[in-house]
């Protein structure tokens, strides 16, 4: 609630040159115009599946269409450096990596694949979801020519950046 007000306040702080947020995107379409008007520069959108039923299960009831509609609205409003963050999980979304990569063909966005990591002792059993970044790249390269990109100064973090030959957008790969 009132995030637009908070963003305006943060944007008015002397020296703030970049303002970005990460969202699950569920309500993004409803707020994206106000976010843009409040001075937000960049958006990172967490999206771990492009399959309706998997998405609903992962998010415990979220609707994929709501997030995808929000992404399109973000692009229509001219946000730059929009990123889709995908946590890569073996047996859950590993059959969707190429479909995610294809989102960059006609959209100026960056799809980032992030290696799955167990966060505590209780999650060690879920290490079976881990997929090495090299395997993710291999899956995408089977049907696409990937071109290494120079890393931009702003907002690149630890990602290795690639582009499918001829694509508008980019692919980022973040190792755990």
Q: Which residues does each PLM region occupy?
A:
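A short, surface-exposed helix-loop junction/capping segment
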Residues: 115-120
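Beta-strand scaffold of nucleotide-dependent catalytic cores
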Residues: 112-114, 174
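Radical SAM/AdoMet-radical enzyme domain recognition
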Residues: 2-112
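Accessory C-terminal segments flanking Radical SAM cores
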Residues: 121-176
């Amino acid at each position: 609630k009132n995030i637009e007000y908070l963003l305006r306040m943060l944007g008015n702080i002397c020296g703030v040159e970049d303002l970005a947020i990460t969202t699950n995107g569920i309500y993004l379409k409803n707020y994206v115009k106000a976010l843009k008007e409040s001075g937000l520069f960049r958006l990172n959108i967490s999206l771990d599946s492009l399959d309706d039923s998997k998405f609903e299960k992962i998010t415990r009831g979220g609707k994929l269409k709501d997030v995808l509609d929000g992404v399109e609205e973000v692009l229509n409003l001219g946000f730059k450096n929009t990123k889709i963050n995908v946590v890569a999980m073996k047996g859950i979304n590993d059959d969707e990596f190429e479909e995610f990569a294809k989102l960059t063909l006609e959209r100026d966005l960056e799809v980032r694949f992030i290696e799955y990591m167990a966060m505590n002792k209780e999650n060690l059993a879920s290490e079976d979801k881990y997929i090495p970044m090299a395997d993710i790249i291999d899956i995408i390269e089977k049907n696409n020519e990937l071109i290494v990109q120079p890393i931009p100064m702003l907002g690149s973090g630890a990602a290795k950046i690639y582009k499918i030959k001829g694509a508008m957008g980019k692919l980022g790969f973040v190792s755990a």
